[in-house]
Swiss-Prot record:
The lineage of its organism: Bacteria, Bacillati, Bacillota, Clostridia, Eubacteriales. It is found in: Cytoplasm. This is Proline--tRNA ligase. The gene is proS. CDD domains: ProRS_anticodon_zinc, ProRS_core_arch_euk. GO terms for molecular function: ATP binding; catalytic activity, acting on a protein; proline-tRNA ligase activity; transferase activity. Catalyzes the attachment of proline to tRNA(Pro) in a two-step reaction: proline is first activated by ATP to form Pro-AMP and then transferred to the acceptor end of tRNA(Pro). Its EC number is 6.1.1.15. One of its GO terms (cellular component) is aminoacyl-tRNA synthetase multienzyme complex. Gene3D superfamilies: Anticodon-binding domain, Bira Bifunctional Protein, Domain 2, C-terminal domain of ProRS. It comes from Clostridium botulinum (strain Kyoto / Type A2). Coiled coil: none annotated. One of its GO terms (biological process) is prolyl-tRNA aminoacylation. InterPro entries: aa-tRNA-synt_IIb, aa-tRNA-synth_II, aa-tRNA-synth_II/BPL/LPL, Anticodon-bd, Anticodon-bd_dom_sf, Pro-tRNA-ligase_IIa, Pro-tRNA-ligase_IIa_arc-type, Pro-tRNA_ligase_II_C. Belongs to the class-II aminoacyl-tRNA synthetase family. ProS type 3 subfamily.
Length: 478
């Protein structure tokens, strides 16, 4: 029938056009659709359910750490945004402004929040007086607006969803420790939930957050060899506290400024899932983040007892996994392709012969392997299989990343690698901003991070040949 056309036929092969392959999956897997507003997207139920699972993980961890959720206004008065000079200069090109309320021109322009440091600082200045009031550990789930010039669903949009944490602490040591604690949590989110390996490290001064003392990052590598910043955690020092006059009486009765951290992950993680795990058949969802972990497909469901057994199986499995039964009248072959394209980690087939033998067939999305299991053990076997799939996807992603991580010791090697073998490039750097700028100008690669796990691949800077200070991961990035 015409309605049974296989969607996978419409997915552009990634080797042919990676950008189109990505867009095809976003649309065909019904993750998002384009809005009539430039750069904005409609996140559809399949996409939003992934975000909800990310939210559950992060929100649970934050509450374990003592954070509280709040909600700040969407608008920021212009005078408030101007208070931290480096911060406003960093965001000025991306700010959207509200100038009118109805037909009346506003006395002061309102910025649609690109991030909320200024709002949190204004509030903290009102409620913090003593060291006994610290730390303040606040987080909010919201959308922000940044007027991007080049957009792509999930990866870079004018409006996007995120969580933004804002905390203030009594000491520098406590704040820095907290910033790294959050980064570690983000790393576990990526590896334990998204099956996505990351490199943890510190940004260079050029790449750090506007107004920060230090920015820490997790960087992931996509199928096409481009890097993606998957999450950041910033130590802002006392810069914002001083700009907004947030003061507290310390343990000696003297006035001091608290130390600030801020950190975020966004819906771009959904784009990362697509580009790390997807293939030419479509989306490939890691089981722990997948809204539907298993789909039951009855074979020859018109035959007596098949549909009843499938429903019984769903009821049994629903107690231990997120499961769906497709009892529509579409052909099994169409369903196989449909759910493969939508990335459901595990397919469970059951037909008359399976029922006779008290068994079902499990088919993995990640490698299409089939396993026959007894219906008496199916709850345990399905859970075990989902863990196996997660571990396999993580190992495969690590293998791909490692195969696409190269070493360069001079600019000739660097340029040749970036043009012919896209991926991470490990190269030494002298610490001079001029060399960092030159590398970007010549190759289009940016410094992704100075990894916490430092190694020496050369004694000299890849760009100027002077004595090296740090190993840096470089790459072209989203």
């Amino acid at each position: 029938m015409a309605g049974d056309k296989k969607f996978v036929e419409d997915i552009t092969p990634m080797d042919e056009d990676f950008a189109q392959w990505y867009t095809d999956i976003v649309k065909k897997a019904e993750l998002a659709d384009y809005s009539s507003i430039r750069g904005c997207m409609i996140i559809r139920p399949n996409g939003y359910a992934i975000w909800e699972n990310i939210q559950k993980y992060v929100d649970t961890k934050l509450k374990e750490y003592g954070h509280e959720n709040v909600s700040m206004p969407i608008f920021i008065p212009e005078n408030l945004l101007q208070k931290e000079k480096d911060h406003v200069e960093g965001f000025a090109p991306e700010v959207a402004w509200v100038t009118h309320g109805g037909d009346d021109e506003l006395a002061e322009r309102l910025c649609v929040r690109p991030t909320s440091e200024t709002l949190f600082c204004e509030h903290y200045a009102k409620i913090v007086q003593s060291y006994k009031d610290l730390p303040k550990l606040y987080n909010q789930w919201c959308s922000v607006v940044r007027w991007e010039k080049t957009t792509r669903p999930f990866l870079r949009t004018t409006e996007f969803l995120w969580q933004e944490g804002h905390t203030i602490h009594e000491t520098k040591e406590e704040a820095e420790s907290h910033s790294l604690k959050i980064l570690n949590m983000y790393s576990r989110l990526c590896e334990d939930m998204l099956a996505m390996p990351v490199v943890m490290g510190k940004k260079t001064d050029k790449e750090k957050f506007a107004g920060a003392d230090d920015t820490y990052t997790i960087e992931s590598l996509m199928h096409d060899g481009k890097a993606l910043q998957a999450g950041t955690s910033h130590y802002l020092g006392q810069n914002f506290s001083k700009a907004f006059a947030i003061q507290f009486s310390d343990r000696n009765g003297k006035l001091d400024y608290p130390h600030y951290t801020t950190w975020a992950v966004t819906t771009r993680l959904i784009g990362a899932i697509i580009m790390v795990h997807g293939d030419n058949s479509g989306l490939k969802l890691p089981p722990r983040i997948a809204p539907t972990q298993a789909v039951i497909i009855p074979v020859a469901q018109h035959k007596e007892g098949v549909l009843e057994k499938a429903k019984e199986l769903k009821e049994k499995l629903a107690k231990v996994v997120r499961v769906k039964l497709d009892d529509s009248d579409k052909m099994p072959g169409w369903k196989y392709s449909e759910y493969e394209m939508k990335g459901i980690p595990l397919r469970i087939e059951i037909g008359p012969k399976d029922i006779e033998k008290n068994q079902a067939v499990l088919v993995r999305r990640d490698n299409r392997e089939k396993t026959i299991v007894s219906l008496d053990e199916i709850e345990i076997k399905v859970q075990e299989m989902l863990d196996i799939i997660h571990n396999s996807m993580l190992e495969e992603a690590k293998k791909t990343r490692d195969e696409k991580t190269y070493v360069a010791t001079n600019m000739e090697e660097f340029e040749d690698t970036i043009e012919n073998k896209p991926g991470f490039i490990k190269a030494m750097w002298c610490g001079d901003r001029a060399c960092e700028d030159k590398i970007r100008e010549v190759t289009g690669a940016t410094s992704r991070c100075m990894p916490f796990e430092q190694e020496v691949v050369s004694d000299t800077c890849v760009c100027c040949g002077k004595k090296a200070k740090n190993l840096v991961y470089w790459g072209r990035a989203y």
